[in-house]
């Protein structure tokens, strides 16, 4: 059967593809060239199949997802569990990092999806705001036995005299804080910079400096009396988390949907300690392009 097909090809192409002798067959130059072209065509077909298959929400062979460390502290465990349950054979990879690194990996195709701080100057064509969190002043507790006062507040003007440890200037959280401080004519004292989330918290625990983070990412430490938190008011300071998909590699629609659903599922965890409902910006009603200005307005109205 195979020999007949090869002879039909030779007849159609008008060139021998195999040199036949008593010891067997050897490919001619034309045969070698046809083999190379055929392999290229097969790879292209397989690539096309994979790209189309990625469009099915029920199929996921691999996923690389990036997010800031303070987001992964809340989202990663339930998200990883949900993805593993839904896609038992999928290769799952998670990456912590700052905005700049996550965005570079996203643009390079190393990540399928990333959760980013919607910071000033961030450039990506398909950012979608999915969550807004109020930031707190996070400090080491004077005594380990001190009861957690999760309702404590601090006015923005009082931050001026407090030494802070913050991420470097290329980090999205730092850009959000700097933009907020500039808008409100606040002069913050940055004692040192730490791009590593764990290193930043080590500085805080030493008592050398405080930091600005969502209380939710440190819930266990706050309730145990290791850290204390004070909600920043007059005006409030929010960070917005946005979802962005890669433009250079296929993105499974079902993956994006699952991430959004999981954020909704753990929304209360992200917003701990709960703020009154009327103080929480309605993310669903705000377009990404106008989100920052809307939050600025909310700062003045709420506090």
Where are these regions (language model features)?
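Hydrophobic/proline-rich hinge and linker segments of small-molecule sensing/allosteric domains
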Residues: 126-169, 238-250, 264-267
């Amino acid at each position: 059967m195979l020999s007949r097909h090869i002879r039909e090809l030779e007849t159609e192409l008008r060139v021998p593809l195999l040199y036949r002798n008593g010891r067997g067959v050897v490919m001619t130059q034309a045969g070698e060239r046809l083999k190379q072209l055929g392999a290229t065509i097969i790879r292209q077909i397989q690539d096309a199949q994979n790209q189309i298959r990625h469009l099915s929400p029920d199929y996921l062979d691999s996923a690389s997802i990036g997010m800031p460390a303070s987001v992964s502290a809340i989202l990663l465990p339930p998200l990883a569990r949900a993805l593993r349950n839904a896609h038992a054979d999928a290769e799952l990879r998670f990456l912590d990092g700052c905005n700049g690194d996550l965005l570079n990996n996203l643009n390079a195709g190393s990540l399928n999806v990333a959760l980013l701080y919607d910071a000033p100057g961030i450039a990506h064509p398909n950012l979608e705001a999915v969550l807004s969190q109020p930031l707190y002043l996070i400090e080491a507790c004077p005594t380990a036995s001190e009861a957690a006062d999760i309702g404590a507040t601090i006015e923005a003007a009082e931050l001026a005299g407090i030494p802070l440890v913050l991420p470097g200037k290329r980090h999205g959280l730092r850009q959000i804080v700097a933009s907020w401080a500039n808008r409100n004519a606040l002069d913050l004292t940055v004692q040192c910079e730490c791009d590593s989330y764990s290193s930043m918290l080590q500085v805080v625990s030493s008592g050398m400096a405080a930091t600005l983070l969502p209380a939710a990412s440190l819930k266990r430490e706050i309730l145990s009396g290791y850290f204390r938190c004070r909600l920043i008011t007059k005006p409030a300071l929010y960070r917005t988390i946005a979802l962005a998909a890669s433009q250079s590699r296929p993105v499974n629609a079902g993956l994006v949907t699952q991430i959004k659903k999981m954020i909704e599922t753990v929304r209360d965890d992200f917003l701990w300690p709960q703020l009154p409902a009327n103080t929480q910006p309605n993310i669903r009603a705000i377009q990404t392009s106008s989100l920052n200005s809307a939050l600025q307005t909310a700062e003045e109205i709420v506090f």
